[in-house]
């Protein structure tokens, strides 16, 4: 019984002694390692030999890509390892002490910085402890939020792929003193970004020579390759622009008498201008290249602007004053003949009026009125017009090929009317009939002028309809060509649509 209790107490005492000895070993080791240690001294056994530093990084997150300021913000953990000749110990002399940690500034560490840093402090890393094991192997893992300058190529925006470089190197050591070796980047803990897809982060070791020195200056450059996800921009910019450009085609379908053709065209043009300003706020103020979406907006604005100009011409044709003159011959041939035939358009009422005129090509002329004073004394019922109508009973219509005939209405050609006005006179003994004939001539002349004005107006209105239909087809083709040709010219258009819109 006593022997069992004695064994327990001995085991407990041995454990406490081991813990106290381990703490004592670690304390003594720290004192031995930092004794006569100079953090400014390069820890190598031979000063003529370079110190090899292995460098890598772990990309955790792409936080922001500022296209306007051309700055990439990333969350990165750096990984640096080297061997310190002065921080080695024999584990048998310090049992239980496998590794020790030194704070920043107490031991030597490489001054590796991000060359293309855009941070106000330049060095954005959090200085952590350096982990050292018994063989002198040192491991330094400082995390940081890095802001690096990156040239943003907006040529294919929003179907663009960006490549941002992260260039790391020693700030004061050359290649003969510090040999910087690259290791592959780690993206196993990467957090996906809602705007960018990470395609890869390949690295490359470079050596650069300066005129001042013969030794090389090595650096490690990692290229962050990322593809923009286009779903957001497609729903908020591209699709509204396509719909607005389609609305611009409705200008040619809107009747000219509605009075809203110009208003609709200008409204569409202003809408595209607003979207253009939204794109300009995102893009950097650079003249190196024009973004793809800006090209599409500009081409659409040009098409809409031309549609407004054509609408003005259409309205001018539609509301043309008949007293302003007849349609020029070349305009009639091009618009009313060629374009109307190509568009399969016919004048309103053309199929109804022309056959009737062809079957009854008759014209009534005042010259055919036979006035016979010798037929007997004129009888009167007390109405002056009755005498006139009695005199017009002999009026008849004769067939004539003249195009001035108006079917269903009494019409007289200008030559016949002038002949009647100057050469045809009734009998000298019937002044009432002469007055009636003069009134008939006036009425016929008014009808003829109205018919001519209606023909001129109908020609101009039909020409306006032809221009509207022709521009509707032409602008539809141009809009489709611009939409497909410009947007599909992006190298990764198919990949972006298949991945983001699927």
UniProtKB/Swiss-Prot annotation:
Residues 260-267 are annotated as: Essential for TMEM35A/NACHO-mediated proper subunit assembly and trafficking to cell membrane. The keyword Cell membrane applies. Keywords: Calcium, Cell membrane, Disulfide bond, Glycoprotein, Ion channel, Ion transport, Ligand-gated ion channel, Membrane, Metal-binding, Postsynaptic cell membrane, Receptor, Signal, Synapse, Transmembrane, Transmembrane helix, Transport. It is a multi-pass membrane protein. Residues 316-469 are cytoplasmic. It is found in: Postsynaptic cell membrane; Cell membrane. Changing residue 448 to A: Impairs dependency on RIC3 for functional expression. This is Neuronal acetylcholine receptor subunit alpha-7. It comes from Rattus norvegicus (Rat). The gene is Chrna7.
